[in-house]
Amino acid sequence: MIDLRNSSPKILVIGDLIIDKYLWGDCDRISPEAPVQVVNIKKENIVLGGAGNVVNNLKSLGATVDVISVIGNCKTSILLKGLLNDIGVNTEYLVTQKNRIVPKKSRIIASQQHVVRYDNESTEEINIESQNLIKEFFNKIISFYDLVLLSDYGKGILTKELTQSIIKSAKKHNKKALVDPKGLDYFKYKGAFLLTPNKKEASEASRVQINDEKTLTKAIIQLKDEFQLDLSIITLSENGIAIYDDNLRIHPTVSREVYDVTGAGDTILASLGFALSCSYDIDSAVKFSNLAAGVVVGKIGSSTASINEIIEYESSLNKSSSEEHIKKFE
């Protein structure tokens, strides 16, 4: 593979910015008020989630990144801008919509176990004014980027009309648009370069229950043809990542003890986009993404993988595993 350590592609991310809050503690008793655990909080940390985690992953890989999204005029929005500034990301293209709620997901981790999550959010679609500002920003700056990533968490930023406008404009400027999809209406992503649904999402979108290689092939072709994609991809969790252009192949995942899958989809999207921007072919890009995801799931919380971590991880793998390129779907 091409050495990516000195690569810095310019990538534009558009989507739902989320705040991820982690409360860490321990638990050694049951509440007298109800049959629930009492967690003694020892520390907390707040990180970028959703499209923000895609941005964070790209920065960790060495990309130059900008983000387009919509925030409100609340304290969470101020916090979000601060987190982006902390990693050197420009907030010039964040549209402020009055009374817009920035989603915040709070997780309690007790003795290294994820106990509960509670959310503060709104899934209401952004207004027409915000959509028009995003289109204006996008059309003004798209020529400066190598690639576009759309991170849809179903929180109202990527409306159907806006998403189609972005994809069509990206094509007009000869820029690949990669999408991490959400929901059942995949026609909003029609014409994208590729989508990154997991097996469950792909089954729902294609209306094909995936349970073997035959049904996987049917579903992945259906997605490519129906939604006019350049490539069709389905992530298969422990079974790897399936790709279809003119033929099906499955790149296996690499063995690692899984601590937390939070944000693994963000890592797949970010690392695929990064590798493709650095002139990787799709198979090499998927292999790179599998390695990046392997690093991330070995950590707790919305995490990232650096180029050096990925190189070290690949080096640590058993030789027979690292040389196995493709395995059949199981």
Regions found by a protein language model. Name each.
Residues 94-100, 107-144:
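Conserved phosphate-binding/catalytic loop of the ribokinase/pfkB sugar-kinase fold
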Residues 16-17, 153, 267:
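Active-site metal-binding loops of divalent metal-dependent hydrolases
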Residues 12-14, 117, 146-149, 178, ...:
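Structural motif
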Residues 1-28, 326-330:
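Positively charged, low-complexity intrinsically disordered leader regions
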Residues 2-4, 10-11, 32, 36-103, ...:
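Substrate-binding N-lobe of the ribokinase-like
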Residues 144-157:
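Short acidic, glycine-rich surface-loop motifs adjacent to enzyme active sites
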